[in-house]
Regions:
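N-terminal helix-turn-helix DNA-binding core of bacterial DNA-binding proteins
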Residues: 6-49
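Basic, amphipathic "hinge/linker" alpha-helix immediately C-terminal to the N-terminal HTH DNA-binding motif
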Residues: 74-93
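Short, contiguous hydrophobic alpha-helices characteristic of membrane insertion segments
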Residues: 4-6, 61-62, 113-114
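Intrinsically disordered, low-complexity serine/threonine- and proline-rich regulatory segments
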Residues: 1-10, 92
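Beta-hairpin "wing" of winged helix-turn-helix
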Residues: 58-75, 80
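Basic amphipathic alpha-helical segments that dock to polyanions
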Residues: 50-57
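Amphipathic alpha-helical dimerization/coiled-coil segments
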Residues: 87-114
């Protein structure tokens, strides 16, 4: 059985935004499970992490929410990406691409790819 690790600091917002971009509206539990699945079940997203992140993203205007009914007929808050959220995804992806390129220089010395 694989050991799960907590989501890396500073990455959850991007993972949430990219999940909503790819999947469309989802409730918090669905977002958390999708992030875990996408990571190959290497990452663990708990309620104490996902819901504060969703609240912050909503306050920033990157996502919006509305109440709906889940697959098991329970009331659930569904989150969707806003126009501002789509622009933020682009910005964050560019930043992570730069960060990844920089880290690659440290992990593979001698390979200058920037």
């Amino acid at each position: 059985m694989k050991n799960k690790t907590d989501v890396w600091q500073g990455t959850l917002a991007l993972m949430v935004l990219k999940t909503l971009e790819a999947m469309g509206p989802l409730h918090g539990y669905g977002i958390a499970r999708r992030i875990e699945q996408t990571s190959g079940n290497h990452l663990s997203v708990n309620y104490g992490t996902i819901y504060p992140a969703l609240l912050k993203l909503e306050q920033e205007g990157y996502i919006a929410s509305e109440w709906g009914v889940s697959d098991n007929n329970r009331r659930a808050k569904y989150y969707r990406l806003t126009r501002a959220g789509r622009k933020q995804v682009e910005r964050e992806v560019q930043e992570w691409e730069k960060t990844t390129a920089i880290l690659t220089r440290f992990l593979s010395p001698g390979k200058e790819s920037l």
